[in-house]
Amino acid sequence: RQNRHEASCRIVSPPVCGNELLEKGEECDCGSPRNCRDPCCDAATCKLHSWVECESGECCDQCRFIKAGNVCRPQRSECDIAESCTGQSAQCPTDDFHKNGQPCLSNYGYCYNGNCPIMHHQCYALFGSGAIVAQDGCFKFNDRGDKFFYCRKENVIITPCAQEDVKCGRLFCHTKKSECDFDYSEDPDYGMVDHGTKCADGKVCNSNRQCVDVTTAY
């Protein structure tokens, strides 16, 4: 047996134009004509004006498509490509970037998914502006395969770095504290060299933390 409250919840009210609720049959509802602040909406009918091309989006302004050529997503690095409005859509085109493996930052790195990952920037992110990449000798710790130094860690299985892959494991930085400073957490990827980072001339770290030829890495 239903109580009154359950029964009342099933009553469907007819749509009311002007109550600021988008209901069945309405394209918009911006309140009364006096209070409406939506230039795209005809407050009297709760329909969009006939000239409206769009209501929202990176390439929509005052209910019309922004002219073609206006940048809607700026270039975030030299590996990225700026996107511009097409004049035919309210949405910014799909994010695009230069080909993975293209040299960047004066050949200190290679493009990877729109960024140019290099160890120096990763040291800066971990330890601040005074940090630089440590000497090559520090990275040799990564062949130990212990709690801190490894190439892969999956559950309890720790895989040490092969000698040729040591620069794809734990990131080592030269700081005021130590010449071989590093950071770690319970997250097995924290403090590790980022995927796509240059590990030798013509080579980058792949997703398995192997230092492989840049032409086959992606």
Curated annotation (Swiss-Prot):
The transmembrane residues are none
- Any coiled-coil ranges, and where? none
Keyword Transmembrane helix among UniProt keywords: no
Keywords annotated in UniProt: Calcium, Cell adhesion impairing toxin, Disulfide bond, Glycoprotein, Hemostasis impairing toxin, Hydrolase, Metal-binding, Platelet aggregation inhibiting toxin, Secreted, Toxin
> What is known about the tissue distribution of this protein?
Expressed by the venom gland.
Task: Write out the residue ranges of the motif D/ECD-tripeptide.
Answer: 78-80
Please provide one cellular component term from the Gene Ontology annotations of this protein: extracellular region
InterPro entries hit by this protein: ADAM_Cys-rich, Disintegrin_CS, Disintegrin_dom, Disintegrin_dom_sf
**Where is it located?**
Secreted
What's one Pfam family here?
Answer: Disintegrin
Annotated positions binding Ca(2+): V16, L21, E23, E26, D29
Give the disulfide map: C28-C46, C30-C41, C40-C63, C54-C60, C59-C85, C72-C92, C79-C111, C104-C116, C123-C173, C151-C161
Q: Which cofactor does it need?
A: Zn(2+)
Cite the Disintegrin domain residue spans from the record: 14-100
Superkingdom of this entry's organism? Eukaryota
Listed PROSITE patterns: DISINTEGRIN_1 (PS00427), DISINTEGRIN_2 (PS50214)
Q: How is it modified after translation?
A: Glycosylated.
Q: How is the cofactor bound?
A: Binds 1 zinc ion per subunit.
Q: Which Gene Ontology molecular function entries are recorded, alphabetically?
A: hydrolase activity; metal ion binding; toxin activity
Would the keyword Cell inner membrane be found if you checked this record's keyword annotation? no
State how it assembles.
Monomer.
Family to which this protein belongs:
Belongs to the venom metalloproteinase (M12B) family. P-III subfamily. P-IIIa sub-subfamily.
Query: What functional role does this protein have?
Result: The hemorrhagic metalloproteinase-disintegrin-like bothrojarin-1 is a potent inhibitor of collagen-induced platelet aggregation by blockage of alpha-2/beta-1 (ITGA2/ITGB1) integrin. It does not present any fibrinogen-clotting activity.
Protein name (database record): Zinc metalloproteinase-disintegrin-like bothrojarin-2
Tell me the organism. Bothrops jararaca (Jararaca)
